[in-house]
A protein has these predicted regions:
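Glycine-rich flavin
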Residues: 1-124, 152, 157-161, 165-168, ...
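Hydrophobic Val/Ile/Leu positions in short beta-strands of Rossmann-like dinucleotide-binding domains
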Residues: 129-130, 153
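N-terminal Rossmann-fold NAD(P) dinucleotide-binding loop
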Residues: 137-138
Length: 205
């Protein structure tokens, strides 16, 4: 779904800069809720498509929580297919990523949200601090900035996209700064205070 958001942001950004190509476009606007809704629809369509391919190629697709109690055996302990036990020679764990939460900070899905919750945000924020400048954080920074949100991107390590090489990261960081994203590297977030209207914090080098 994040790639669908990026597609909308990329198109809007190109229209905003169309005069560079000699094309004048007036009266362009966007509907944030529709952009979010489209990304969810795309995700749903893809999931159905994958399900069809599984069935077509005779791949068993079980839904639930897999638990490995003994080597070579997986038990579905919760979910639709609870109770099924699979015996196999090899087990490949590809469970995806889980957002890491900051200690002593309650995630309410409104003022403080995980990346998964951000995929379903109902209202565009006027400003946002994104903690973590990895691929997911960078995607959200680009998306929200393209539609006018004031974005501060914070990373504890010394460059954005910390798992990528420095040269690639430097190009991305330079581009972000040119687009107006406030990139804070080698920076930690401390003293976070959340109230009904805003979130305040200290950014410490």
């Amino acid at each position: 779904p994040s790639k669908a958001l990026l597609k909308s942001a990329e198109l809007f950004n190109k229209i905003q800069h169309s005069e560079d190509l000699g094309i004048t476009v007036k009266g362009v606007d966007y509907d944030f809720s529709k952009i979010i809704g489209r990304s969810r629809n795309v995700a749903g369509t893809m999931a159905k498509g994958i399900g069809f391919l599984f069935k077509k190629n005779k791949v068993d697709h079980l839904i639930g929580t897999g638990t490995i109690n003994v080597p070579g055996m997986v038990e579905i302990t919760a979910g639709k297919d609870k109770g099924q036990i699979l015996s196999t020679e090899r087990i490949l764990i590809a469970s995806g990523c889980k957002p890491r939460r900051l200690p002593d900070l309650e995630v309410d899905g409104e003022r403080v949200m995980t990346s998964r919750q951000a995929l379903e945000m109902k209202k565009q924020p006027k400003s946002i601090v994104i903690v973590g400048a990895g691929a997911i954080g960078a995607e959200f920074a680009y998306f929200l900035n393209a539609f006018g949100t004031k974005v501060t991107l914070v990373e504890m390590l010394d460059h954005v996209l910390p798992v990528e090489d420095h040269e690639t990261a430097a190009v991305v960081e330079k581009s972000f700064k040119q687009e107006g994203i406030d990139c804070r590297v080698s920076t930690a977030v401390e003293n976070i205070k959340v109230n009904a209207k805003s979130v305040k914090m200290d950014l410490v080098k």
